């Protein structure tokens, strides 16, 4: 195996590093770029990997991937998504930037601006991660490919923007690897980026891909510079007030599509009834869908949001056996629990139903008959596991064993929780009956299959159309294409169970439909339980836009199986236009697990004393949009105390208090200066970005726009000091009035923008400001909705500080990691100070060091922005507390005065 690398070719950095890491036995030859290696290519192409079987690889990412896989590593879906992003987004932008800098002589700071969105995407993806790498706790090919693309332009971490601390830290870590250092030095030869000039001069000038990149769509802070026209337009929109603005629409039920209007049908994945949803379930479907539904209503779009519990299947039967209840009793019990949890989280379903209804049976059987009549169903004999002791076939969750793909020891008979792959129960190694733990035998049973190969062509045609016109998340597209690429196979739609929708066909009447055939039909049947005019939503694809929200493991059933059923039924069903899938939310350093009780569950959240809106905010702030993210108690405290208390809450409270204290609760006259108009334009730009992002269902990123506006507001108040101006002459008092009036109108706008995310806080702000009803519609412009003379109500703080002791208590209470283990091992009533050292192992020290670094960066950022002393001091105290805790964890004195003095310098 030989690797040929061209001198001065930037793509050589990553392949040389990958070879050093994972392919030590490869022979490396360095050639001039003009030398031709691949005989069947008309033009020279380097780098090239000449494989021992006579084949060639000549894409740098493919070469890196080959080295990585050949060394025994595996690639997950997330790895492939990152490599796709790097090739489609990052590489083109970096190539153009490197060419502009090296060949055209443009300043590095100028070309850096052209890649800032991509770099910010990387920085945000790395921020808050406990791991120093992009996707795992260990280095992967993704880190090397991305680092190798960035390195030729950046060379040194000091060239990255100061505010991108997470990216700088990652870049430095990878750059310090011996293999990466050797790869870079052997190619750059101490010449820096200029070494690439001879190669780049022979290349055509790169063209930046047209249109906005994914990163720019995701990025809420990357605002374009403001022109005089922007500022003038913002001032004119402000002056119009609410004139011509649409009024909030009444929503009489049942809500039905209206011809000529934007009709939005929203579904969130039906939660399994048999268990209490955890925070990952909540953010993955119902909360994300709720934010979008509330946003649509704010825009006066005709919107219906439906959901319900998925109540059929083996999970319900096994749960009923565990609790000594009937399946129906289990469904009734847990449906009530789900309903209560979602009500507490303020999820605004228009209708929350269930699948154990007559409508579910009728509609499922109708679709089945239509598929049968059109010959889209097959009959086949299936080998299944049967427990002789229990006298039943062991479908899905009735059996557990070792995963045939990843060797996970507790894989279910339908899917592995660890690797996510779908499994046939007979494929399990060492299977056991879930009920009696006996080893089952293999027996045959006749079943019905959906003939997916026969439907594949029409499915592909529909998918291409939906991909091109709809907003599908990248993971949804990737997973769907993977299924199509691998070729569709007939899929079993029946099970040997009692609890489910009965199969209406002779020879199969003792069976029920497999849950993934009839569960998505639950969206339709739940709508039918809401209104007898359900077909206006579900058989009207021309005038309805359907949004499906779910976690990524549900994607194939919503993008392949369910649409195939509806296409095959040939009954003009509404198919999904926009499929919005999240990655996974982890818990601290582990994973949530319903069956193993790991993590915070919905019914526990309300017992913490933390309001529902704070939970909503934090879950949406860390929403796993591009990759997996993690719930962290420390980070929850940090975000509450910094973003909510010190940023958003501080601004809204000050704006209202100034009106109350200085102007007797009456909005003052406003005479705008140029700096005020510029602020209006900044706010308008953030509002436009917020709308753009939410229309694209970029929920997490749109939240940043809200926080940006409140930051602008805090800075505006701090610079203009209305509390001083009000004590001055008449002109200064007028200035105080203008600043206060603009600020309180910004607070009013924030209350509307906050509504999808924090509906209770939104209502509290609106009540405090006594906002008129007609102002509670989200417009596309920032206008003055609280005119001079408007009387506001009593203003009070919106948020409370979360204390470290409170958070540590909750961390211990909800387990996970060392604390959970300790509580089991040491139930004795030792004093807290005696127990503390047990939790201060190397893992805790590492965690504290990361928290300390993050808090230190935060304090420096606040000081750099010249924030108020009242804002900085609490953060400094938090920093000192972390230093003290770290010293204790390391067994040092917590209060070394000489070191403290040095730190203050």
UniProtKB/Swiss-Prot annotation:
PROSITE patterns, per database record: AA_TRNA_LIGASE_I, GST_CTER, GST_NTER, WHEP_TRS_1, WHEP_TRS_2
Question: Keywords assigned by UniProt?
Answer: Aminoacyl-tRNA synthetase, ATP-binding, Cytoplasm, Ligase, Nucleotide-binding, Nucleus, Protein biosynthesis, RNA-binding, tRNA-binding
Sequence motif 'HIGH' region, location on chain? 271-281
Query: What EC number(s) does this enzyme carry?
Result: 6.1.1.10
Single annotated GO MF: ATP binding
Q: Which GO terms describe its cellular component?
A: aminoacyl-tRNA synthetase multienzyme complex; cytosol; nucleolus
Q: Is Iron-sulfur given among the entry's keywords?
A: no
The protein's job, in short, is: Catalyzes the specific attachment of an amino acid to its cognate tRNA in a 2 step reaction: the amino acid (AA) is first activated by ATP to form AA-AMP and then transferred to the acceptor end of the tRNA. Plays a role in the synthesis of ribosomal RNA in the nucleolus.
Instruction: Give the protein name, as stated in the record.
Output: Methionine--tRNA ligase, cytoplasmic
The scientific name of the source species is Xenopus laevis (African clawed frog)
Lineage of this protein's species? Eukaryota, Metazoa, Chordata, Craniata, Vertebrata
